[in-house]
Amino acid sequence: ISAEVQVYEPLIRKYAKQYGIGEYVELIKAVMMQESGGQGNDPMQSSESSFNTKYPKKANGITNPEYSIECGVQEIKSCLAGAEVKSPVDMDQIKLALQGYNYGNGYIPWAKETYGGYTLANAVEFSDKMAKEKGWESYGDKQYVPHVLRYYSLGRIPNGTGNQVIVQVALAQEGNGGDIYWRWYGFGR
């Protein structure tokens, strides 16, 4: 995750907490990293989101980074709910939510009804279908899920061990300092 994205962590945390998805800060940072690397005035690339009601609904229409983050967090929340994500490590459902963030609100119900969830193959199929329907050369990023997940530390096991995932989940707990997880894992923090 770039320094430019890290600068936005306090705002990401603020809006994630405000919209009830405080445990997904790392996922939101990974999305921002893929969308913009933290660059520009629309770092979440959320101008075309249904949550943008103040700026033009065109690429880079939002010119206020904080508003972009607020809209992006709401869009991610909507995708997490639509995909029925249960936790920050519910990777099958997170993949569905991420592709939905990139493709818009039609993908999640289509993938669930047609295939029972996300696959790379159905992401390609949906993109091709939508591009054809709209008369466009392409539609979205067919590889969006792997592109985002390369930045998501909870989505992989660093250095071949599972300990880091557990520690990061514990650290992400707001309000209790992760104490229940630290005790569960054998630390007397």
Predicted regions and their residues:
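Short, functionally critical alpha-helical segments immediately adjacent to catalytic or ligand/cofactor-binding
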Residues: G22-Q39, S46, I69-V73, A97-Y103, ...
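Surface-exposed patches in mature extracellular/periplasmic domains of secreted proteins
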Residues: G22-K29, A83-Q99, G178-F187
